[in-house]
């Protein structure tokens, strides 16, 4: 089957931004003007094509990265609309990994907002060329040039306007294209009647000034153009387009456009710019990978190269399990067998589809540069490489951030336990930032994710898609107990109930052990006061008592016990009697050894703009945190602290609120430390049922 579009005329792009900047509305207008949909769907009406999950339509936010194919000016454009909420950062991350170019949407009023910085950093991580659409120019307070300045200063990007708005706020009537040096005036509300006209007299001077600056900026990136510009003092439209494109591909220039997607102004010009300036698969560096012998290799964007693709998303839907793939090289055919080189497993390609949000079109093959989905894969998960068995390669995978919040989950009815397990397995296959584990001590199922909204929506999906009602609670903190002093303990177990009785007697010395030793047992019995066969059971009795502690039922750690004396009975002594005696001696001794409660301490690192440094440190201190270090570099502050795990629940939400969404943090286990007396008393009282 021949190609519908040559690779040079394919664009794989993402639309990404801060929440509420108008990404999904922009995508909807692109689909409308390019003929994919014949009626405009609005996000606030719950009718957007790319927002096809129930929760997306209810909440008016984009949760999953919806992939859509359309065409414009004889080019195939594959678009991914990504969420702007920080809880769904993996959707942006995996999109950036497989895209060739990005349209970053900014609000003309809000400008560079918190999530825009995060998205920009993600695009930087994968070196994705980009252009900017300053949206919502119809809103009160819209300021195109101010936003352009913010992008330059806060994102350190060489952003340059290639358009100017004619009017603003309620009077946005058209757009000046500085490249063609023409004005485009909108004559109807639907944005379909556009008049190409000369630049209005009152804006000629401003347009001339910005066009001259644009020519100069473009020429600086190209030796050939700088000579022409110095010789003739200007560049032609074609030369400007060539220079802008080169600047975008080399990451030396970010063209900035303007308009209002909601008011149907500027979107067709955005599509023109995608075709003119963003890269085709052949314009970006070939994908790198590792061969079975450990050597690095590349796969060029070429139908004739060995097949390779990256699975960047797995989704369960009513039609079955869909695996989204980015084709990097070769051809993938329906019915063929391929290798999952990441897992060293063979896979069969049952069906292939390209998507238009929740609609799909079956195809016989996918080719280099395509974004599509595969049905029938059993072992493939996000980040896996698919390739030919003859030419195996493992492609660079994607960065998967660690979850930052966790909660306990259980089904509302015991009969739903199996359904809950299946739901959790399916959801964790789809989303690599959603982790499921079982707490070995509490036996609770614990789910972890990127934020409270993330987990809330996953629990909601369990109900809608898997018909499982679940109770959600805070996870139990894994406290521990230990001792701070030494003492002796004695346990004597004697029972006589007719016939053979029970008798066991041990004397022990207890003391704190080295940190990390857990339970340490030493036998110092001499003279056979306790026969050898009873020493093991006595030790086991103590060890088992360790598992449930003496203060609040938590495991006792770092305790050294020395068996020093005891007695036995020739007839009545037994292993069980000595096991019970060992437990009694342990409980007797530990009460006299100043037992204390320990809590897990977490190593926390917080990164935020330095404006929020004081708030971040103050908040960590209020959580019983100990600040261990801080630094400020290029407007960004980093704080290192040790904070009790018990105080970190809800921190992701608090940090986001405190830093306007611009703070990020990482957290890992450090060590156990003693719980302050007042906190310990409350925990012990609660666990003993006195609360």
From Swiss-Prot:
Biological role: Catalyzes the GTP-dependent ribosomal translocation step during translation elongation. During this step, the ribosome changes from the pre-translocational (PRE) to the post-translocational (POST) state as the newly formed A-site-bound peptidyl-tRNA and P-site-bound deacylated tRNA move to the P and E sites, respectively. Catalyzes the coordinated movement of the two tRNA molecules, the mRNA and conformational changes in the ribosome.
User: What residue ranges are annotated as transmembrane?
Assistant: none
Against NCBIfam families, the record matches this protein to: EF-G (TIGR00484), PRK12740.1-3 (NF009379), PRK12740.1-5 (NF009381), small_GTP (TIGR00231)
Question: What is its subcellular localisation?
Answer: Cytoplasm
Q: Please give the CDD domains that the UniProt record associates with this protein.
A: EF-G, EFG_III, EFG_mtEFG1_IV, EFG_mtEFG_C, EFG_mtEFG_II
Positions bound to GTP: 17-24, 81-85, 135-138
Name the UniProt key words of this record, in alphabetical order: Cytoplasm, Elongation factor, GTP-binding, Nucleotide-binding, Protein biosynthesis
Source domain of life is Bacteria
Q: Give the signal peptide as a residue range, or say none if absent.
A: none
- Annotated Gene Ontology cellular component terms: cytoplasm
State where it is primarily located.
cytoplasm
The UniProt similarity line reads: Belongs to the TRAFAC class translation factor GTPase superfamily. Classic translation factor GTPase family. EF-G/EF-2 subfamily.
**What is the protein name stated in its UniProt record?**
Elongation factor G
Task: Provide the taxonomic classification.
Answer: Bacteria, Bacillati, Cyanobacteriota, Cyanophyceae, Synechococcales
InterPro entries, A to Z:
EFG_II (IPR041095), EFG_III (IPR009022), EFG_III/V (IPR035647), EFG_IV (IPR047872), EFG_V (IPR035649), EFG_V-like (IPR000640), EFTu-like_2 (IPR004161), G_TR_CS (IPR031157)
- Which stretches make up the tr-type G domain? 8-282
Gene of this entry: fusA
Single biological process term from Gene Ontology:
ribosome disassembly
Which Pfam families does the entry link to?
EFG_C, EFG_III, EFG_IV, GTP_EFTU, GTP_EFTU_D2
